[in-house]
Curated annotation (Swiss-Prot):
Protein name per UniProt: D-aminoacyl-tRNA deacylase
Self-association state and partner proteins as the record states: Homodimer.
UniProt note: domains: A Gly-cisPro motif from one monomer fits into the active site of the other monomer to allow specific chiral rejection of L-amino acids.
GO MF terms held by the record: D-tyrosyl-tRNA(Tyr) deacylase activity; Gly-tRNA(Ala) deacylase activity; Ser(Gly)-tRNA(Ala) hydrolase activity; tRNA binding
Motif annotated as Gly-cisPro motif, important for rejection of L-amino acids, chain positions: 138-139
Record HAMAP family: Deacylase_Dtd
Length: 150
């Protein structure tokens, strides 16, 4: 599993010109599911993200987590995180999970991170054409990948 985690002052998802979901201070998580991901990958990522110490403390050091600041999460599925553009100019997506599997795993990930984070969790709509807006804070952007399997 691969995610792009962005610290935001606000973020939202619109679909067809209509606001679908939004958060204030917190994290926007773009989540990609690979064809090899398992429940272990989802659990690892669900524990990692809410505990990342990427928010500044009173001394200006990145020392506080989403849980510490009482922030929110906006989680958006994004299969293009597994794009491979190493050959040619048109990316391939063979590492991405097929849509049927990705939908199931994405839904499980959202439920797991809701449980782990203990904060408001909003989402986009799996497979929809979404417009994602954000005000990146910092900017702080972290790319996470679940540990490789032996």
């Amino acid at each position: 599993m691969r995610t792009v985690v962005q610290q935001v002052r606000e973020a939202s998802v619109s679909i067809g010109g209509e606001l679908h979901s939004s958060i204030g201070t917190g994290l926007l998580v773009l989540a990609g599911i690979s064809r090899d991901d398992t429940a272990d990958d989802l659990a690892w990522m669900s524990r990692k993200i809410p505990n990342l110490r990427i928010f500044e403390d009173e001394k200006g050091k990145m020392n506080r987590s989403l849980k510490d600041i009482g922030g929110a999460l906006l989680v958006v599925s994004q299969f293009t995180l597994y794009a491979d553009a190493s050959r040619g100019n048109r990316p391939g997506f063979s590492e991405s999970a097929p849509p049927e599997l990705a939908r199931v795993l994405f839904d499980r990930f959202v439920e797991s991170i809701r449980h782990e984070a203990g904060c408001p969790v909003e989402t986009g709509v799996f497979g929809a054409d979404m417009q994602v807006s954000l005000v990146n804070d910092g900017p702080v952007t972290i790319i996470l990948e679940s540990p490789k399997k032996p």
